[in-house]
């Protein structure tokens, strides 16, 4: 399935993100909604750890257009609700996290788990189911190591399935390393990247920019399809009654 409009590839540091992908755990083609780095200020120097690409299913565009078409990139960037709609919308998402610096699975998964649990407890939605899902999540990563250029990939199903896969190169296809069934965990992974307290402001801003442009093009195409008949209709004489 082709994306709704033309999208371009992106490069973050030395890592390229293709315009479309067919990820593990999905039968669909997803388009690149945005990409950016994650980093931290360490001793006065900004250090980049990972490059992140966020992909969405084609049906995301009409879904998001209902509420967000006509908004500027800055308006979308500033809207917590917009990113919640991206995270929770009824369409597939795929996130590729490529390491710029070496990272162990334990380091990565424990930080993600910590953020998820803190968020759930803060909003009162943490249950035993989430606790078990987190344990499975930690187990998947426990013995993994990720040298520079390796990728951690998440396919998020609207049904609540989180497919996790790993690659030592830029491949995004192949078999899944694990599938965890928990809707809150599935959504929390992407939320931790582009949500209110997301770890990648760069990816968040880029998603807003690219999606705003896609919605603008989608709206323009819709207007071109329906505009002409509407114009012709307006020329029909009105007969008084």
From Swiss-Prot:
The keyword Repressor does not apply. GO terms for molecular function: chalcone isomerase activity. One of its GO terms (biological process) is flavonoid biosynthetic process. It comes from the Eukaryota. The record marks 108 as: Important for catalytic activity. Keywords: Flavonoid biosynthesis, Isomerase. The keyword Isomerase applies. Substrate binds at residues 50, 115, 192. Part of the biosynthetic pathway for all classes of flavonoids, a large class of secondary plant metabolites, many of which are brightly colored. This is Chalcone--flavanone isomerase C. It comes from Petunia hybrida (Petunia).
């Amino acid at each position: 399935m082709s994306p709704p409009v033309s999208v371009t590839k992106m490069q973050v540091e030395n890592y390229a993100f293709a315009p479309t992908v067919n990820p593990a755990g999905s039968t669909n083609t997803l388009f690149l909604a945005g990409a950016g780095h994650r980093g931290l200020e360490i001793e006065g120097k900004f250090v980049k750890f990972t490059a992140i690409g966020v992909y969405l299913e084609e049906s995301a565009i009409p879904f998001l257009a209902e509420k967000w078409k006509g908004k500027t990139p800055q308006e979308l960037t500033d809207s917590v609700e917009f990113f919640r709609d991206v995270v929770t919308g009824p369409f597939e998402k795929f996130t590729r996290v490529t390491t710029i610096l070496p990272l162990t699975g334990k380091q990565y998964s424990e930080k993600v788990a910590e953020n998820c649990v803190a968020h759930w407890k803060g909003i009162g939605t943490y249950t035993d189911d989430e606790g078990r899902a987190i344990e499975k999540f930690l187990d998947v990563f426990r013995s993994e190591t990720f040298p520079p250029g390796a990728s951690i990939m998440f396919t998020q199903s609207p049904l609540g399935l989180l497919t996790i896969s790993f690659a030592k190169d830029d491949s995004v296809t192949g078999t899944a390393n694990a599938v965890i069934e928990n809707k809150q965990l599935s959504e929390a992974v992407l939320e931790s990247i582009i949500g209110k307290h997301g770890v990648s402001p760069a990816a968040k801003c880029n998603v807003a920019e690219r999606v705003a442009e896609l919605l603008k093009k989608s709206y323009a195409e819709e207007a071109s399809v329906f505009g002409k008949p509407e114009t012709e209709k307006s020329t029909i004489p009105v007969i008084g009654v």
